[in-house]
Amino acid sequence: MLSLYRYDSFNAMTFDLDASVVKDQAKAFGADLVGVVSAKTLNEFPPDPKWPQTPERISTHTKSVIVIAKRIPAGAFRAKSNIPVQYMDMLVLRQMDKAAYRLTEWLELEGHPSFVTAAQETDWSYKNASYGRLSTRHLGIEAGLGTFGLEVNILTPEFGPRIYLTGILTEAVIEADQRITEQVCIGESCSRCLYSCPSDAVRHFGIDKRACATEAQEFGFTTILQYWEHFIRQDADTMRALLRDREMFGFWQGLLRVVGSFGDCPRCLAVCPVGNDYHAHLADIQKVIPEKTPEKVEKAKGFKTARKNNEPIDGLNDWNARWVGPDGYQGMVARQLQAFKKEQREKEEAASAAASED
């Protein structure tokens, strides 16, 4: 059996399951990244204390949360429109949910009640449906998978922001991972996410959700409400015409395949230079950012100056700094790029040597 005693003879805490075994199982089921965080930590540090997104509000029995991530294949970010990314996201989420479900089944077979929450749904009672019951971004950070970027996506060293996450809440006590305290995001001196945002929604380690949604959810909930409010005020002929226009077709497509209604504008994800997937597949095509303007450049300079002068910044206050990386940026992306280039050289040299032997 994999289960261990909860306490040893000295009353020091041990664990119900070996964390490495749990992670191996999760990866065997399809997870690309796996981390563990204690429910106690999540309960003590809710993202927004006014609207606590904590395990204890869902189940008081939860002891640990296993966080799994699936990467979004980089090829979708080379397409000309959002649609390939949105459809690929749907496929990624399906695979992520399957992996989470299979891990939940395995945990219960080991004797530990477990369940998965809906990762991409929000709750109407949580700040007008702008929050879910848990913040998967914060779960990932607390589980040691990454830190916030300037646009407050979670950035992982492996795949940057090009991932989706979910959490398995379990009654098993599992050793938690350490948070990454180095800031993964290059920050204000990069600002590529800010430059690329078509709705100028990026704030200083924050996001204007309403502005973001105008691009991320072309056929989302707010758009549907506005459409029908407009529709019911029209005469019969106009109503018939509206039922046959592009927006109605978009709503139908969204119901069937999520495309257009899913919350994802891929621009900030596509241009982020964090992760070897960017260096391998995106650096060439995303080098130039068409949306970059002098106004956005000045905005980024203002962010940099504010941080240098230790001015008050909501996204970097004492509470939020925990998830940005309290140690600041120390060159992680540069180190990654050097390692990636070295690996590529070694592969090319090995291939060349093999070819010469033939």
Stretch-by-stretch model annotation:
Residues 311-348:
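Long, compositionally biased charged/polar accessory segments in the mid-to-C-terminal portions
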Residues 285-286, 290-297, 342-351, 357-358:
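Compact disulfide-stabilized, cysteine-rich extracellular microdomains and processed peptide cores
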Residues 2-96:
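Non-catalytic, usually N-terminal nucleic-acid engagement modules in DNA/RNA processing proteins
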Residues 224, 298-300:
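Charge-rich, acidic-biased intrinsically disordered regions
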Residues 55, 302-303:
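FAD-binding beta-loop-beta segment adjacent to the flavin cofactor pocket
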Residues 77-79, 224, 282-285, 355-358:
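Short conserved micro-motifs at the rims of enzyme active sites and ligand-binding pockets
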Residues 290-298, 306-315:
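Short, C-terminally biased terminal segments at protein or domain edges
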Residues 85-86, 91-293:
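Catalytic cores of enzyme domains
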